[in-house]
């Protein structure tokens, strides 16, 4: 598993499994989402550990991007995980271009949710970038 796209997809699957069962062993989850006898890629652990450790910050940054009256708890679990993963890459993975992070998040939404979710994810992440002052 060498492509960043495949690693990102495995990260989504791992984060979804851990959100569903927070007591799950991460190594067991990685074994489930990776092809058999595959070493855990460093970027996979970076994404999963990063999203989990920064979850409160990510959620705080996502909340203002929602429509008035909406909360994160109203989102579907896949959409929320995709948004967290995309925002993590935008905020903390400096080598990742913002547009590429959004595109990858859209692709995950199309695969694991639907076209409406893909548009929603695009809008939320694009709004975040637009609302964030550039350095």
Swiss-Prot record:
Q: Which Gene3D superfamilies match?
A: NusB-like
Name assigned to this protein: Transcription antitermination protein NusB
**Organism of origin:** Lacticaseibacillus paracasei (strain ATCC 334 / BCRC 17002 / CCUG 31169 / CIP 107868 / KCTC 3260 / NRRL B-441)
**UniProt cross-references to InterPro entries, sorted A to Z:** NusB-like_sf, NusB_fam, NusB_RsmB_TIM44
Q: What biological function has been recorded for the protein in this entry?
A: Involved in transcription antitermination. Required for transcription of ribosomal RNA (rRNA) genes. Binds specifically to the boxA antiterminator sequence of the ribosomal RNA (rrn) operons.
Q: Lineage, please?
A: Bacteria, Bacillati, Bacillota, Bacilli, Lactobacillales
Q: Which UniProt keywords apply?
A: RNA-binding, Transcription, Transcription antitermination, Transcription regulation
The Gene Ontology biological process terms listed for this entry are: DNA-templated transcription termination; transcription antitermination
Which GO cellular component terms are attached?
Answer: cytosol
Tell me its family.
Belongs to the NusB family.
């Amino acid at each position: 598993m060498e492509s960043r796209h495949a690693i990102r997809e495995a990260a989504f699957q791992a984060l979804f499994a851990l959100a569903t069962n927070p007591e799950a062993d991460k190594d067991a989850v990685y074994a489930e989402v990776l092809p058999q006898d595959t070493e855990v890629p460093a970027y996979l652990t970076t994404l999963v550990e990063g999203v989990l450790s920064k979850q409160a910050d990510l959620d705080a940054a996502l909340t203002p991007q929602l429509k008035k009256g909406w909360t994160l708890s109203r989102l579907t679990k896949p959409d929320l995980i995709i948004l967290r993963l995309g925002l993590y890459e935008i905020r903390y993975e400096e080598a990742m271009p913002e547009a590429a992070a959004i595109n990858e998040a859209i692709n995950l939404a199309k695969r694991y949710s639907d076209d409406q979710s893909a548009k929603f994810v695009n809008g939320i992440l694009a709004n975040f970038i637009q609302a964030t002052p550039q350095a």
